[in-house]
Regions:
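ABC family nucleotide-binding domain
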Residues: 1-140
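C-terminal boundary and immediately downstream tail of ABC-type ATPase nucleotide-binding domains
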Residues: 141-162
Length: 162
C-alpha cells in the first residue's frame, strides 16, 4: 500500500527504507533485499538517492521511494491511497508517470484519486464513491461520457467546467 503521507522511516536511508520489510517480513537475506530495492529504485528514478535520508528529498521523491518500497514486497495488487494529494502541483506529474509505467507493465492497481485525467487515461475500471458507497462502477469511457448516476453527472459537470 502506498499512502498519501509516504510514511518513510526518517532515520533510515532510502535504500534501507526499501530493504527493512523485505528482511523482516519476507525473510530475504540482505544481499537479495538490496538487489530488489535497487531494481525498483531504478524503476521509479530514485537510484541516485539511495544513500540519502528522506529529509533530503522532495515530496514527489518521497512518494516515488514509497512506491519502490511497496514494489519490493512483490504484491499482486498495489493499493494507492491518494498518492498525489500531499504533493506540490509540480511533483504530481512525476508520481503519475511512475504509476502509468506500472499500469503499462501490467501491475494491478487500486487507486483512490481525484486525478480525473489520470483515472480516465490509465484505468480499466472506474468506481465513483459517495458517502462511503460505490454508486457507479464502469469503464472509463462510460464514466466520463455517459454516467448513469445523477451524483456522478453533477461531479463531472463541475470537474469538466474547471
Amino acid at each position: 500500500m502506498v499512502f498519501q503521507q509516504f510514511y518513510l522511516f526518517e532515520n533510515m536511508s532510502v535504500l534501507d527504507n526499501c530493504t527493512v520489510a523485505q528482511i523482516k517480513v519476507l525473510n530475504r537475506d540482505k544481499e537479495s533485499a538490496v538487489k530488489e530495492a535497487k531494481k525498483y529504485l531504478e524503476l521509479v528514478g530514485m537510484i541516485d538517492h539511495a544513500d540519502k535520508k528522506p529529509s533530503m528529498l522532495s515530496g514527489g521523491q518521497k512518494q516515488r521511494v514509497a512506491i519502490a518500497r511497496a514494489l519490493c514486497m512483490n504484491p499482486e495488487v498495489l493499493l494507492f491511497d491518494e498518492p498525489t494529494s500531499a504533493l506540490d502541483p509540480e511533483m504530481v506529474n512525476d508520481v503519475l508517470q511512475v504509476m502509468s509505467k506500472l499500469a503499462e507493465s501490467g501491475m494491478t492497481m487500486v487507486v483512490v484519486t481525484h486525478e480525473m485525467q489520470f483515472a480516465r487515461d490509465v484505468s480499466t475500471r472506474v468506481c465513483f464513491m459517495n458517502e462511503g458507497y460505490i454508486i457507479e462502477d464502469t469503464d472509463p469511457k462510460t464514466m466520463f461520457t455517459n454516467p448513469k448516476h445523477e451524483r456522478v453527472k453533477e461531479f463531472l459537470k463541475n470537474y469538466l467546467n474547471n
